[in-house]
A protein has these predicted regions:
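Charged catalytic carboxylate motif
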Residues: 26, 67, 169, 205, ...
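A short, acidic, amphipathic alpha-helical segment used as a generic capping/interface helix at domain edges
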Residues: 248-263
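Glycine-rich phosphate/pyrophosphate-binding beta-alpha loops
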Residues: 60-62, 193, 248
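FabD-like malonyl-/acyl-CoA
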Residues: 1-138, 184, 188, 265-293
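Non-catalytic positions within long, well-ordered alpha-helices that form the structural scaffold/packing
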Residues: 76, 178, 259-262
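Alpha/beta catalytic cores of group-transfer enzymes, especially the acyltransferase/condensing modules
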Residues: 9-11, 38, 98-246
């Protein structure tokens, strides 16, 4: 079975999407619609050279979403997924590309998500750290022993877990994890503790927007971050999406489940090749590629 997977925040780069805009009338239309929907010219930032402007959460998230979704659209009849998944933000790209959400509704939700997350980060300064070379259980136990908020946020692949929490909590966790034998426990240059209870204000704000959005039947199952299982019911998808901002991204479990369900090849749709690399850590022989024009 063929899967298409969609990257999350961090995959952005200056000039992203310009080739799509220049190559396709459909892409042009979608980018113009995006500028109208967002109320600012995101194409100027995406197609420009200013990496700092692109790093703002309110820009980064819609930019990655647009790159992924428009690339899938430009593929036309070649885009025939039998299963889809997206890492964190990428789940929204996957939902639009598989037909569960309209392009405009998906973009509005992503924009609302980005703004709400930005606000939550400003209200409650916090951070994340990547932990390499320890069993999940060891990391989970150490996190649970710390009195401040520290939780597993992204299960990226075996031996790579990102934790999320208060600045002081992450500081303590990194020290304890290094003592426990982690190959690395490094703070990440992110704006806040994504996928942790500290994102509750953003989750509540996004929930209201999700509630009034129409979700439809899709063309194939989506493997969602909070369950790591194949789901096709629009109402169930909606409920899982509401939990996503404060729950762990179960990406390792998602990859393992897709493979168990008959995955034979995976194509990454959007900027970067991070997800292909993670799949290779689970199954070196798996056929993987990037979607191209």
């Amino acid at each position: 079975m063929k899967a298409y997977v969609f990257p999350g925040q961090g995959a952005q780069f200056p000039g992203m999407g310009k080739d799509l805009y220049e190559a396709s009338a459909d892409a042009k239309k979608m980018f113009k619609k995006a500028n109208e929907t967002l109320g600012f010219s995101i194409t100027n930032i995406m197609f420009g050279e200013d990496a700092e402007a692109l790093k703002q959460t309110k820009v980064t998230q819609p930019a990655i979403f647009l790159h992924s979704v428009i690339l899938a659209k430009v593929k036309g009849d070649y885009f025939k997924p039998e299963m889809v998944a997206g890492h964190s933000l990428g789940e929204f790209s996957a939902l639009v590309s598989a037909g569960y959400l309209s392009f405009e509704d998906g973009l509005k939700l992503v924009s609302k998500r980005a703004m709400a997350m930005q606000k939550a980060c400003e209200q409650n300064p916090s951070t994340m750290a990547a932990v390499l070379g320890l069993e999940n259980e060891v990391v989970e136990n150490i996190c649970s022993e710390i009195e401040e908020v520290v939780v597993p946020a992204n299960y990226n692949c075996p031996g790579q877990l990102v934790i999320s929490g208060s600045n002081n909590g992450i500081e303590i966790a990194c020290k304890k994890l290094t003592e426990a034998g982690a190959r690395r426990a490094l703070k990440l240059p992110v704006g806040g503790a994504f996928h942790s209870p500290l994102m509750e204000p953003a989750r509540a704000e996004l929930e209201t927007a999700i509630d009034i959005t129409e979700f439809k039947e899709g063309v194939c199952p989506i493997y969602q971050n909070v369950t790591a299982t194949a789901i096709t019911n629009p109402e169930e998808i909606k409920e899982n999406l509401k939990k996503q901002l404060t729950a762990s991204v179960m990406w390792t479990q998602t990859m393992q489940q897709m493979i168990a369900d008959g995955l034979s090849s995976v194509t990454e749709v959007g900027p970067g090749k991070v997800l292909q690399g993670l799949f290779k850590k689970v199954d070196r022989k798996l056929e993987s590629s990037s979607a191209t024009l």
